[in-house]
């Protein structure tokens, strides 16, 4: 997925999620994006997730979350850190923070947990990091919280960037904690 397509997809998702009315000049661009998403089979895949985002994030969605949503469907790639090659979980989080906020987080999920500020699960807000024990070790998986107990992540080999509910049994039993990224948490 090119950066231009990613940006356009993010903008289309933002418009859909917020229920924004497009200006007449922008309607053709929006229609073109809908056709592109439909032609690639992404509109059907994103349908339910767009509805979740509309109700979950609404107008309070951070630029980080909306940018991340633009990468739905990008394949998982172990060690991957770009849309062109695919993402692993920590590569996805690192890329989103670097692209959107300009912060460079550590590469591995456990390093990201150690470098960020611990918060209580009840304090989660869109853009915070959520960590899970998926490989029999703490902080072995990371995602970006988007609100309403949902997070976006790159889960595992053979899958792609997607939104999931933290209340599902698998994620609920493996939850390790929540972290907030502060400007001082980035590496030079």
Predicted regions and their residues:
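...with weaker cross-activation on analogous glycine-rich loops/strands in unrelated enzymes
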Residues: 4, 55, 103-160, 165-168
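Catalytic cysteine-centered active-site loop
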Residues: 74-126
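Acidic, glycine-rich catalytic/binding loops that coordinate metals and/or anionic ligands
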Residues: 166-188
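Short hydrophobic alpha-helical membrane-anchoring segments
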Residues: 15-20
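Soluble non-cytosolic domains of exported or imported proteins
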Residues: 55-62, 83-91, 118, 169-172
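Sec/Tat-exported extracytoplasmic proteins
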Residues: 68-80, 96-105, 134, 155, ...
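Intrinsically disordered, low-complexity
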Residues: 2-10, 21-75, 181-188
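Solvent-exposed, polar/charged alpha-helical surfaces in well-ordered, non-transmembrane soluble domains
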Residues: 62, 66-70, 91-95, 99, ...
């Amino acid at each position: 997925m090119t950066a231009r397509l990613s940006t356009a997809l993010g903008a289309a998702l933002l418009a859909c999620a917020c229920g924004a009315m497009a200006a007449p000049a922008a309607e053709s661009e929006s229609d073109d994006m809908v056709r592109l998403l439909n032609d690639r089979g992404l509109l059907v895949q994103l349908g339910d997730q767009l509805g979740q985002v509309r109700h979950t994030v609404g107008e309070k969605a951070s630029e980080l979350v909306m940018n991340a949503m633009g990468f739905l469907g990008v394949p998982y790639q172990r060690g991957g850190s770009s849309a062109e090659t695919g993402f692993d979980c920590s590569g996805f989080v690192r890329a989103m923070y670097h692209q959107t906020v300009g912060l460079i987080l550590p590469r591995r999920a456990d390093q990201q947990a150690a470098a960020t500020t611990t918060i209580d699960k009840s304090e989660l807000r869109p853009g915070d990091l959520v960590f899970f024990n998926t490989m029999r070790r703490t902080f072995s998986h990371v995602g970006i919280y988007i609100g309403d107990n949902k997070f976006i992540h790159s889960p595992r080999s053979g899958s792609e960037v997607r939104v999931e509910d933290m209340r599902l049994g698998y994620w609920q039993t493996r939850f390790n904690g929540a972290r907030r990224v502060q400007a001082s948490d980035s590496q030079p």
